[in-house]
């Protein structure tokens, strides 16, 4: 605030689609919105993502960790909950300062049970998105899928490096030829970034791909085009694909 900045934009570090959008910034300023959460349409890969609901005139965030076991299927129903939280958050710092003068934000604590190696563990975390409950006039804004492009595995990296995306003024844009991204499942060998780089020196054409599963050591020697549903298996013996290969609805083994 002392530097004259009144709007803060926060996003997950792995979300390559999260850029400062001047249109959203102007919307925040013009309508004096204190807190804004970007939402986007669910796909089968996002059914567990947190969603918004309204109670007593206030927007609230519901994360799957707070959903009873017998209601999880309902929570994951794309027809009932059509959008989910991208964790792209915009906050008006003047409104935040005013709110903090009234006391600390009461953020929802999530309990996640997981294993660290073979040791059961309980991870406690607070969801920044739950802060929207603390602001009168908070907004959930549905945005295009281009603003939610997380890279957590090489599966995601393959998609973003392919011809499914172009870079326009610092923003990744999905090809207009695709409505949904293909399903990618790369095995343990290709989860290693060095193996990934060596095995895919040139990313194949994925425009007409629906599903890709790669097991074991598979290497592309040059350009290639993958179409439909493709399964490449190099578990028993490395599978080497020559430059110019076109693979359509096939299952190949090394």
What is each model feature region?
Residues 6-13:
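Short beta-strand-to-loop acidic/aromatic patch adjacent to the donor-nucleotide binding site
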Residues 16-18:
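A short, conserved beta-strand element in the Rossmann-like catalytic core
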Residues 1-5:
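Active-site nucleotide-sugar/metal-binding loop of Leloir-type enzymes
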Residues 21, 26-254:
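Left-handed beta-helix
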